[in-house]
């Protein structure tokens, strides 16, 4: 006897196979059964559309707003430029990190990120500070400069008011902050910190809240928060990946890796982590996805060159069908199923 809904099952299998066979698949629409499905190559971003030359030195990081209307760029010169993406005109030029007295060689901005509602932009700098700016009018919302080592990364929670910050300071490696400041605590500036992970420390007569984690000293190279705001993942300079429950603020897992970690990202559903690692012996970038709960490696992408610089990657495309990675070979690599289209 033919199973119930057998025809529907077969037709669904045909649609799934057409998606798998589509090299440039970049749509969330269900393929039609009336014609063979194939996304056009010309609809895939393979060519340079414009060049932005307002940075005066190396560009270290860029980020699009969630609605795609803005692009923020940052780099070695300490500038943060925000462009509108229709005509690619600058709408803001932020110089907050230039005003730090650390000197021109220590003012580089290594990370920027828009809040989920695109109201705020956080920037992290080598001059040991982070700044949150209001994208609408350009005014500074909050700032923290109490760190003794560079601030390397940040990630927003869904409420667009709280965010986590990772630094290379063993005293303040990982913290949860809010844009709503509190002047209590006797610190040198308003206290925007809600919670911190790391070794015990005190500020004046006040002991800041710490977790009960026993990870010892660590320094953070990158940090990511799941889209639902329940989990956080951090990559450290001693090649560890640590995940945390942001509700209980307790550590969930820790996985030791072989070499230097340069970036980490959650997939949209939070089930995967995308990890970049610098294989120093081979001068190659290693890029793979892993189960965010078990740490099991699921897929590896080969081909990116990495020796000296920080290489980052992210999920991209409709339905996150692709992995996009930088490369020291001056290539942007789009990986769909383990191969590289460069």
Predicted regions located by residue number:
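WD40-repeat beta-propeller superdomains and closely related acidic/aromatic-rich repeat-like regions
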Residues: 1-342
């Amino acid at each position: 006897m033919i199973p119930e809904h057998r025809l529907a099952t077969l037709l669904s299998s045909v649609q799934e196979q057409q998606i798998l066979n589509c090299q440039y698949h970049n749509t969330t629409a269900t393929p039609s059964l009336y014609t063979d499905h194939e996304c056009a190559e010309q609809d895939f971003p393979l060519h340079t559309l414009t060049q932005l030359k307002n940075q005066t030195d190396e560009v270290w990081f860029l980020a699009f707003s969630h609605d795609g209307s803005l692009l923020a760029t940052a780099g070695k010169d300490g500038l943060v430029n925000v462009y509108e993406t229709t005509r690619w005109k600058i709408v803001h030029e932020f110089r907050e990190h230039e005003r730090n007295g650390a000197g021109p060689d220590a003012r580089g901005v290594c990370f920027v990120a828009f809040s989920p509602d695109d109201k705020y932009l956080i920037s992290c700098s080598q001059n040991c500070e982070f700044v949150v700016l209001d994208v609408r009018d350009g005014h500074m919302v909050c700032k923290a400069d109490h760190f003794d080592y560079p601030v390397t990364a940040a990630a927003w929670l869904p409420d667009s008011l709280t965010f986590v910050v990772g630094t290379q300071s063993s005293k303040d490696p990982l913290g949860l902050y809010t844009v709503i400041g509190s002047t209590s605590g006797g610190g040198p500036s308003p206290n925007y910190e809600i919670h911190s992970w790391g070794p015990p420390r005190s500020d004046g007569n006040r002991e800041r809240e710490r977790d009960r984690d026993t990870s010892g000293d660590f320094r953070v190279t990158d940090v990511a928060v799941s889209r639902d705001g329940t989990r956080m993942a951090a990559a450290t300079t001693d090649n560890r990946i640590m995940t945390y429950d942001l509700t209980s603020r307790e550590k969930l897992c820790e996985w030791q890796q072989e070499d230097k970690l340069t970036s980490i990202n959650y997939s949209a559903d939070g089930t995967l982590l995308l990890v970049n690692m610098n294989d120093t012996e081979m001068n190659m970038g290693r890029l793979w996805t892993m189960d965010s709960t078990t740490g099991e490696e699921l897929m590896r992408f080969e081909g990116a060159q990495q020796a000296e610089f920080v290489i980052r990657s992210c999920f991209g495309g409709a339905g996150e069908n692709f992995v996009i990675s930088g490369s020291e070979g001056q290539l942007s690599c789009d990986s769909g199923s383990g191969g590289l289209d460069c």
